[in-house]
Amino acid sequence: MRRLLIAVLFAASAAVAPSAQDADLRSTASAASMAGVMTPPLSPRNANYTITARLDPATRTITGSETIRWRNITARPAADLQFHLYWNGWKNTRSTFMRERALSGGNDDRRRRPDEWANIDVTAITVAGSDRTGTRRFITPDDENPNDETVMSVPLVQPIEPGGSVTIEVAWTAHVPRTFARTGAIGNFFFIAQWFPKLGVLQEDGWNCHQFHAGTEFFSDYGVYDVSLTVPAGWPLGATGVERERRDDAGGTTTHRYYQEDVHDFAWTTSPDYLVKTARFEHPRLPPVEMRLLLQREHASQAERHFDATRTTLKYYGEWYGAYPYGHITIVDPAFQSGAGGMEYPTLFTAGTRWLAPDGVTTPEGVTVHEAGHQFWYGMVGNNEFEDAWMDEGFNTFSTARAVAQVYEPNYLALRYFGGFVPWVFRDIALSRETEGNRLAGYRRDAKSDAQSTPTYRYFPSTGGSITYNKTALWLNTMERWLGWPTLQRALSTHFEAWKFKHPKPNDFAVIVNQVSGQDLGWYFDQVYRSSNVFDYGVQDLKSERDGEQYRASVVVRRYGEAIFPVDVLVTFASGERVTEHWDGKDRWKLYAYDRPSPVVSAQVDPNRVLLLDLDYTNNSRTLAPQGRSAATTWSMTWMLWLQDCLLSWAALA
């Protein structure tokens, strides 16, 4: 095991900082990757798709066919094939997706017109030349909802044995909806994702092919995608992979052929309104990447901001975790009110901005860094987003906050007025990585809603995001402040190297953290992952009384929450003396008593704010020389100044 760890660590180090002797090899590999070719193969390539599809914008219809070459890489025979038909989750209000969406307080979709819903209908399917169209059926492995049609099972004439392969031919039609879950159309803007019948993942215990849920995303195997898309002539198109061929057809259409190896999904977009920009990422120790931006014309002045944020991601994630291997990436600026912003797919992602995007505010930078970062956490490390979404969303939220802090601090609070159209930047309120970057406020609200070890698809729909994104970012940042960034960085890069183009599970990460840190951190993961208990430490009481020539001081600290973490207690005296106590945090309370020639002034639990998961930092300190009056005066004056500025600004518009 130790030799394996050393080998993995060495490989991770090599991935982050390759030697100059490998320059020629990197150059050759980079040229191939820019054509969508990955040599040698990076993944098992056991689910390969050749797809042909045509979009009719007038009817919002996609007509498609696909050939899937699938190989059974498990040790169990496959008696059936199971497919995701995601768009049936938006077919009506009775699907599991829509039922859960209603629970989360989403839009009232009953007001949608009939043509604003979606569907995907498989019209024919053959397996190894045998017509299986009449045998297909919908199954509901998660909730037995008889109205859900998002998983299709096709029984096989003969099981596919371990190591065996099969060719599957599928034909289907689909109706493009008014946007659901960042997929769909508005006007002539189309963003098309999860749009084809896609195989689930066969594992040793059977098919992992969950129904489509409102609070979860996706899971699939890696392979080669060769996709030909026919759209109206003159409409720019962006997609996963590299465009290998473009052919003008009769009837005013153009067919674009895109190709990419070693990815687990394929998404695309087209619109006559896109402005196309290109740029390049270069780095002395990382492979170059061609960047292509599909931009709304009203955002033309923000092109470089999108490119710069993408460069930030490729640089810092590449240095911290491992190189981005594909030689290209497509950035999509979605149409106004499309609802398609902030989503990730292999080698392509959607960002999101506004016409008025002032400097000092991370719009579009924040969402661009986050979605580009998903190329690493989700794209290359392919965790199961149905069950363990925190392994990409949480890792990526932590990484986003760290990368943004490297480049874009200070960034400021901004509020929007007049329906979100006019921004107002409060340049005396800088946002911090530790709180706003890690989304502490959202976690506080939902901290007890679910244990993180609960499969993601079983989280309560309206609170799952706080557990998936926010809690993970906070406990990772806590580990950084506690163990040190060098240790956590080695753990994350080792995990990345060990599990890229594979499907890790939560314990795989915990094992690597223990190995790299040299500690058994099971107690920590038991609390942050397997429990919904919360952390909350504070100072309950602080006293100082004169006793002759001395002062007798007492400090009572308390664990208000159920979760346990070691914390420091800083006690400060009027003489300037500072005493730091190290408390294991296990007892409900602890008393510290002192005899000193000067009185105690204040006490503070966790003065360096290591425990970012602490729900209530306002109770962490007490002072015997309160500054409440001056604080109230300061805040009152500040708010009055803001109010005056706002009134003057609005008056100027009158």
Predicted regions span which residues?
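Beta-strand-rich binding/interaction modules
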Residues: G238-A239, G522, F535-G538, L542-N608
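Hydrophobic alpha-helical and helix-loop surface patches within well-folded domains
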Residues: N46, L85, G89, Y258, ...
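Ligand-binding face of N-terminal immunoglobulin V-set domains in extracellular IgSF glycoproteins
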Residues: T61-G89, T93-S95, G105-G106
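Short acidic/polar inter-strand loop motif in beta-rich domains
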Residues: W90, A174-A181, P607-N619
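Extended, low-hydrophobicity, Ser/Thr/Pro/Gly-biased non-transmembrane segments
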Residues: S104-A124, A128, T150-V157, T167-Y274
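N-terminal, polar/Ser/Thr-rich
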Residues: A20-T63, I186, L521-W523, Q527-V528
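Bacterial N-terminal signal peptides
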Residues: I6-A14
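Solvent-exposed beta-strand/loop surfaces of large extracellular or lumenal domains
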Residues: M34-L42, K91-P155, T179-T183, V242-G251, ...
